[in-house]
Amino acid sequence: MDNRPISRSAIPNLEDLPDDVKTKIQSVQEKTGFVPNVFMIMARKPDEFRGFCTYYDAIMETECNITKAELEMIVVATSAQNDCLYCVVSHGAVLRIRSKDKNISDQIAINYKKSKITERQRAMLDFAVKVAKESQSINDSDFKILERFGFDIEDAWRIASVASFFAMSNRLANTFSMLPNEEFYACLLYTSDAADEITG
């Protein structure tokens, strides 16, 4: 059991939060049985919390040509590149649920190029990692590779949006030493419906 504080930042009392923020957190708790630490950490800034949740839902929950499991692969691969403990553990948990593969998260976090994934998924992650680490060097050839695997410009936008959003999340989590909940390590106990709620 990790007894360290979950963040360097102050953690608000649930009862002191605006009603809509409190309702969101309580809804997550009802569905999953716990409150992911990121919710309480972000809730200290209600406007940022609302923006965080809205953008998360827009890029992670809306339908596109990329599966929800593949979106989680992007989060895990790019967060690993950014050395983000919180996001690798929490989204690794969701990836195991969504992919129904207990090994995939560790493989992607350690070395996605050697992971048991398709060539299409590897091309997707190559692009995502380049967005996360060296976006200034992205050029036409990167988009041509995506096109070869069936990704269009809107898919490229989604990949880049996920990588960019979580680059921000990774930096906040690292700066304020955010710790993942113990419950994430027992993720296989949760259902796919719960996976929609436990990260953001």
Q: What function would you assign to each model-found segment?
A:
Residues 190-200:
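Single conserved hydrophobic/aromatic residue that forms the stacking wall/gate
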Residues 1-192:
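Hydrophobic alpha-helical segments
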